Each structure stands twice: as structure tokens, then as C-alpha cells.
């Protein structure tokens, strides 16, 4: 899985989640470290995705 596919997978998890998703859970899902997930979330935000970090995990805000 390349970086673009990984970010697409992260978005898929967030879009399907009813509750916040932790960075560790996202890391396990896509097979990378939590730090890579943090970097990917930053890139996704820079691309205009409204992802919010809460104390329970990441949430994709509805448009």
C-alpha cells in the first residue's frame, strides 16, 4: 500500500466510524506506526478534509 492508498484507507475508516477512532487503531488498520498516521492526518487536513482530533480519537466532521 502506497501513501496515497493509505490515506484513502484512513479516510474510509473515518467515514465509516460512528465514534472517534484512535491513532493507534488507524495505525493497526493500515499497518503503519501511529506517527505515520499523525502525519497522514495532517496531510489530509491540508487537502481540505475536516478531521478533528479529540481526546478519544479522530473524527471526520460532516459537511
Segments predicted by a language model, with ranges:
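Extreme N-terminal segment that seeds HTH/winged-HTH DNA-binding domains in transcriptional regulators
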Residues: 1-29
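Key DNA-contact positions within bacterial/archaeal DNA-binding proteins
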Residues: 35
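HTH-adjacent hinge/linker in prokaryotic transcriptional regulators
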Residues: 42-63
Amino acid at each position: 500500500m502506497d501513501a496515497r492508498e493509505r490515506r484513502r484507507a484512513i479516510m474510509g475508516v473515518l467515514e465509516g466510524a460512528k465514534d472517534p477512532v484512535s491513532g493507534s487503531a488507524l495505525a493497526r488498520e493500515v499497518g503503519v506506526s501511529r506517527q505515520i498516521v499523525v502525519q497522514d492526518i495532517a496531510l489530509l487536513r491540508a487537502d481540505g478534509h475536516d478531521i478533528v482530533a479529540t481526546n478519544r480519537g479522530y473524527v471526520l466532521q460532516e459537511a
